[in-house]
Amino acid sequence: MTAAVWSYPKSGAGEEETIFNMVNAILLRIHQSGHLAEITDVQKGLVKEALDYYKTIRGNIRQAYPYWPIGTSSYSDNWSALALDAGKKHYVAVWRRGGEDRITLPMTRLAGKEVKIRCAYPQERPVTFGWNAAESSLSVRMEEEICARLFEVEVVSDEK
């Protein structure tokens, strides 16, 4: 038996709430639920995009090792991050729930490596991010107070 996380987008929820919901589940095994016939077309598009992306990475997820770039979070934390190390790919989920609009995530597992980073989900929503190779850190800025993004980090070379 394999555990999973329920994904339940609510009808009437905004785009960021739907994205937040989907990011909660993408790095694990998704049990998709909810009244999908009642959500908006925009929400359906976001759910579809998340599930399509999940299908491309689920093989890597099974073999990946989890780590928490800013430590394990508590309920009252403004920021949370969970990463999966799948060798040449790292998947980094970042959640903002208030506080400052930017955070820097130490990514020490990637020290000394040349990487390519993209916002994998959602691809067409605003987010500012950058890689600091000298510090092996990922900086993320999200303007919405409640939001989440999923980044894909590809190790291009094991040496800079």
Give residue spans per PLM region.
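Active-site-proximal substrate-binding groove within the catalytic cores of carbohydrate-active enzymes
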Residues: 1-127, 139-142, 148-152
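Non-catalytic accessory/interaction domains
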Residues: 124, 136, 158-159
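Extracellular/luminal ectodomains and secreted, surface-exposed scaffolds of diverse proteins
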Residues: 127-133
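Mature N-terminal, pre-catalytic/accessory segment of carbohydrate-active enzymes
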Residues: 143, 155-160
